[in-house]
Amino acid sequence: MKLKLLNMILSMMNKTNNNNNIIINNTLDSLMNKKLLLKNMLLDMNNKKMNNMKRMLNNNNMNPAGANPVVHRIGPAGNINNKLQHLNNMNNWNTQIYNYNKNMEIMNTMNDKLINKLLYKMMTLKLNNMNINKIIMSKTINQHSLNKLNIKFYYYNNDINNNNNNNNNNYYMNMMNKLMNIMNNNMNNNLCNILSYYYKKKVTIEPIKLSYIYLNSDIFSKYISLNDMDKYNNGILTNYQRMLNNIMPKLNDHNISMNYINNINNINNNKYNNMINLLNNNNNINNNNNYNNNNNNYIGNINNIYNNMTIDNIPMDILMYKYLVGWSIKFKGRLSNNNGRTSTTNLLNGTFNNKKYLWSNINNNYKLNYIPSNHNLYNNSNINKNGKYNIKVKLNFI
């Protein structure tokens, strides 16, 4: 609809020019004028969207408690799904791949699984039936392109407090970095070059060290599973709660979510208010045929969109999934020697809901200004002397 409206306006401009026998000698100026017209239309739509949202919020604030609010529906030009965080979208995936050949796509997927097992074996190397390292590795994240493959994984040093083992781990990781060509030593027999022959494209390996165990659910669940489950026969809840209190942050999820969402909301309001002021200022500028003056005024006003904001802090303020606001652990299986009976234990801390109306006066029917919950899930099964058990870890970042 918007494109049809734009085409109608442009066609009317062309008809007017033909009727008046106006010959445009500079086609570049004509094209840029059309672009300026399109930009003004976009600013006008943003202006209408902000006015609709402000009108809706004002009507909601004027309704007393217990009264039926008047719902104003926002059309397609409005904020679709009312998501607050639209500036920085992040996709969660383990493999990003596309091939025009279906057989090649299947082969690359099989190779990815084999490389995942290979890297896991290398990171958990054993000498003389003993682990020389206490490194926990996550699943690999494979990003394919036409001429390159980037393999990324996270790892955590589980024995960082032991100096002797820590020295072994440092030596082991230095050896791994050389093998994976992380240090750019240009070895012909490094793992990246070897894998390039199989994938027929350039391969890079990107290991990322985590400083905290709870930053990845895969590593977190493996860390819990590696602990001695036999010593918790008398009660897993108390013992594990004590262990988790030492490694997990003290969550103040209410204040973290409120400050983060309100901060992004203020950024959006300031940005749209500046855009509205920009539109009003452009409308007050006298229209003339001098394109250079009009273009200079427009560019000068575009730079004012981020007025009253510290632009250096905006990328960090809108960064998603940097705060842990909720975690839960579910143990299910034979965890104790109580007649071999299967039991289930749930540990929950924080919140898994990022809605703003939880602490604001906005009615629940609106559910505006929310961050989609990022639930990072992982299941891990293991066996102890009592039988098999399963650990399910769920993390929520904002």
UniProtKB/Swiss-Prot annotation:
Component of the mitochondrial ribosome (mitoribosome), a dedicated translation machinery responsible for the synthesis of mitochondrial genome-encoded proteins, including at least some of the essential transmembrane subunits of the mitochondrial respiratory chain. The mitoribosomes are attached to the mitochondrial inner membrane and translation products are cotranslationally integrated into the membrane. uS3m is essential for mitochondrial protein synthesis and required for the maturation of small ribosomal subunits. One of its GO terms (cellular component) is mitochondrion. Keywords: Mitochondrion, Ribonucleoprotein, Ribosomal protein. The keyword GTP-binding does not apply. InterPro entries: Ribosomal_uS3m_fun. The gene is VAR1. Component of the mitochondrial small ribosomal subunit (mt-SSU). Mature yeast 74S mitochondrial ribosomes consist of a small (37S) and a large (54S) subunit. The 37S small subunit contains a 15S ribosomal RNA (15S mt-rRNA) and 34 different proteins. The 54S large subunit contains a 21S rRNA (21S mt-rRNA) and 46 different proteins. uS3m, uS4m and uS5m form the narrow entry site of the mRNA channel. It is found in: Mitochondrion. Coiled coil: none annotated. The keyword Flavoprotein does not apply. Pfam families: VAR1. This is Small ribosomal subunit protein uS3m. Its main location: mitochondrion. GO terms for biological process: mitochondrial translation. Belongs to the universal ribosomal protein uS3 family. GO terms for molecular function: structural constituent of ribosome. It comes from the Eukaryota.
